[in-house]
C-alpha cells in the first residue's frame, strides 16, 4: 500500500467498488490504507496472500491491481483475480514468470499493463477528484523542504509510509 496502491484503493472506492483488499509486506502501510479508507480488508503479502484474497472475495476479485512492480505482488494480483476477472499491472520493474495456462488461459483472465496516462485523462481525473471530494494529498505521510531532499529520498526508499513530498516555501 504505497502511494500508488493507496490512490488506486481510494479511486476504486469512489468508483463504487463494494470491497477493496490491500496486500503489503509492511503492516504500517496496511494500517494507513485502512485509516484513509482506501481498503476495507488487508492481507499480509506472503505465500498465502492470493488464497486469502480469494477467501475474502468469494473466489477472487473482479478487478485486481498491482502497483508494487514486485514479482510477488504481481502474482498475488493475478492469482487473486476471479475467473473471467481483470488484472491491471501498474508497477514498474522486475520480471514475471507465471504458469500461463493455469493462471491466465484456463481462468480466462484479462491482463492490462498501464503506465502514464494522457493529458486529457489527467484533466478528467482532476475534475472527478474535485467532484468526488477526494484529496490525494491525504496519502502524503512525510513532507521535506527541498534542502532536505536526501533525507526525503532515504525515507521514501524505506517504504514504510505513504507518499513522500518535497515542498517549497512558495
What are these regions (language model features)?
Residues 2, 6, 27, 71, ...:
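Glycine-rich phosphate-binding loop at the start of an alpha helix
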Residues 75, 119-170:
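C-terminal hydrophobic helical "lid"/dimerization subdomain
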Residues 31, 35-110:
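Glycine-rich cofactor phosphate-binding loops and adjacent beta1-alpha1 units
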Residues 86-88, 99-139:
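Rossmann-fold dehydrogenase core element
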Residues 1, 22-23, 42, 62-67, ...:
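Glycine- and other small-residue-rich loops at beta-strand/loop junctions that grip anionic moieties
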